[in-house]
């Protein structure tokens, strides 16, 4: 195969990442900004579930992200189990201009951990950082919650494309590092690890990026 050429579906790893958080916090625009570099001011609530994909290079490997998005309204809770199944990363999103969306982050995190391995790679995202004059959730508040729960943290603006790439890339990089570390520890010189293009379900290996481990609540 010629160096430098890769077909669209030629990837080394496939990671499922879910977007969670209240309705209206900008999950769909984060998804469209990252996967298509698009933003819609007239965003309608997502009906049911949609997902988009994008591939990134991480340490010379092609990592394909399958990113799932659903509306945050309670009436969609019936799809919860299928939505979370197999997810190895999550962006937990709140709107920095609406404090109630930040208050609900704890409930979303509990739901996430109820349906996935508790060591899933999670990035707490304070979106709409471009609306500086309307900020209701201070950066320190988000940072403190993230540190308490061993989450990663970034503030983003899907509108201005601020930190959107960084947030997704950080989650994918951390997942990849856990997977590659596991392969090295298992003596994966003979190619006994996951096959090319295989979807990875990290389970307990994600604990490698946690600072203080995880306690059962």
Curated annotation (Swiss-Prot):
GO terms for biological process: intracellular protein transport. One of its GO terms (cellular component) is endomembrane system. Its main location: membrane. It is found in: Cell membrane. The keyword Cell membrane applies. SUPFAM superfamilies: P-loop containing nucleoside triphosphate hydrolases. Gene3D superfamilies: P-loop containing nucleotide triphosphate hydrolases (3.40.50.300). Signal peptide: none annotated. GO terms for molecular function: GTP binding; GTPase activity. It comes from the Eukaryota. A lipid is attached at residues 214-215 (S-geranylgeranyl cysteine). InterPro entries: P-loop_NTPase (IPR027417), Rab_GTPases_membrane_traffic (IPR050209), Small_GTP-bd (IPR005225), Small_GTPase (IPR001806). The keyword Lipoprotein applies. SMART domains: RAB, RAN, RAS, RHO. GTP binds at residues 21-28, 69-73, 127-130. Keywords: Cell membrane, GTP-binding, Lipoprotein, Membrane, Nucleotide-binding, Prenylation. Pfam families: Ras (PF00071). It is a lipid-anchor. Possesses GTPase activity. Belongs to the small GTPase superfamily. Rab family. PANTHER family: DRAB11-RELATED (PTHR47979). This is Ras-related protein RIC2. The lineage of its organism: Eukaryota, Viridiplantae, Streptophyta, Embryophyta, Tracheophyta.
């Amino acid at each position: 195969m010629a160096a430098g050429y890769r077909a669209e579906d030629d990837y080394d790893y496939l990671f499922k990442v879910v977007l969670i958080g209240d309705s209206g916090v900008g999950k769909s625009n984060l998804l469209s900004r990252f996967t298509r570099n698009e933003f819609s001011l007239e965003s309608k609530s997502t009906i049911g579930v949609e997902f988009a994909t994008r591939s990134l290079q991480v340490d010379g490997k092609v990592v394909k992200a399958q990113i799932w998005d659903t509306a945050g309204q309670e009436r969609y809770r019936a799809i919860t189990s299928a939505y979370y199944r197999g997810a190895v990363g999550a962006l937990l999103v709140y709107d920095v201009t609406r404090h109630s969306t930040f208050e609900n982050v704890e409930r979303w995190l509990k739901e996430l951990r109820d349906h996935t391995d508790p060591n899933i790679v999670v990035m707490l995202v304070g979106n709409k950082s471009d609306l500086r004059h309307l900020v209701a959730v201070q950066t320190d508040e988000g940072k403190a919650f993230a540190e308490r729960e061993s989450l990663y943290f970034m503030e983003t603006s899907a509108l201005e494309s601020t930190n959107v790439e960084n947030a997704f890339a950080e989650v994918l990089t951390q997942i990849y590092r856990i997977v590659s570390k596991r392969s090295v520890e298992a003596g994966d010189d003979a190619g006994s690890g996951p096959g090319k293009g295989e979807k990875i379900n990290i389970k307990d290996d994600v604990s490698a990026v946690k600072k203080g481990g995880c306690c059962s609540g």
